[in-house]
């Protein structure tokens, strides 16, 4: 099975020192070496200050600057894992460095589209829906939405590098590690008005084109973030 891991942590206000950056990179390299057999995709995200939020749907998109989360933690990266079951995916997630100073949301995925090439400097479109209207895969509402995504896929096929729907938010698990102890919590990390519902990674020449493409996605809200292009995946 495939699982989507969304990495959440406090946004930095100042860059790390060269020594601290070297230490952190070594931690991420160790994780990649450890989890390499399970990692299928992933990357860090560019600063949240550069995020774009799109609301209103394809018929009347409204574009605003900044990330969707108004809390202390922002999305800092993502992974796609292949694991035998949820327990195996959570065991991988607890080794992600972000779990020690932030949190990792782990979501079962639906119908993952494998990347058509290595991802670097492309654009993550994170799809969000109001909690009360988020539908479960297989429901009539979900099937209707899937048809709309199929239409988007036909219109933007050459720009879609990968993507997937996520299972209902009730199936998500939040992973945090503090003082060597792992805490698992049912549900997403932030109890907000919106929850993740799916994602795409889009190829675009610049942010304007990425926003134009993301505005076509049939979702209540889309957060557009550039990939940092440092994972080599």
Please provide the spans of the model-predicted regions:
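Conserved, structured core segments of small domains
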Residues: 1-233
């Amino acid at each position: 099975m495939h699982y989507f891991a969304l990495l959440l942590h406090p946004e930095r206000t100042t860059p790390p020192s060269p020594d601290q950056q070297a230490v952190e990179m070594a931690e991420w390299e160790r994780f990649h070496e450890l989890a390499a057999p399970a990692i299928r995709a992933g990357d860090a995200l560019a600063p949240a200050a550069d995020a774009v939020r799109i609301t209103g749907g394809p018929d009347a998109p409204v574009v605003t600057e900044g990330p969707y989360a108004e809390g202390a933690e922002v999305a800092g990266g993502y992974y796609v894992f292949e694991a035998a079951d949820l327990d195996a995916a959570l065991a991988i997630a607890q080794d992600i460095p972000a779990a020690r100073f932030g949190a990792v949301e782990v979501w079962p995925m639906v119908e993952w589209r494998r990347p058509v090439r290595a991802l670097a400097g492309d654009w993550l479109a994170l799809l969000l829906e109001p909690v009360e209207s988020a539908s479960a895969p297989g429901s009539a509402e979900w099937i209707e939405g899937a048809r709309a995504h199929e239409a988007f896929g036909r219109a933007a096929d050459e720009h879609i590098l990968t993507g997937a729907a996520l299972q209902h938010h009730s199936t998500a698990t939040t992973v945090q590690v503090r003082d060597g102890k792992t805490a698992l919590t049912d549900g997403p990390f932030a109890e907000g008005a919106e929850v993740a519902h799916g994602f795409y990674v889009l190829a675009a020449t610049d942010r304007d084109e990425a926003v134009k493409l993301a505005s076509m996605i049939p979702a209540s809200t889309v957060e557009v973030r550039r990939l940092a292009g440092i994972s080599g995946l």
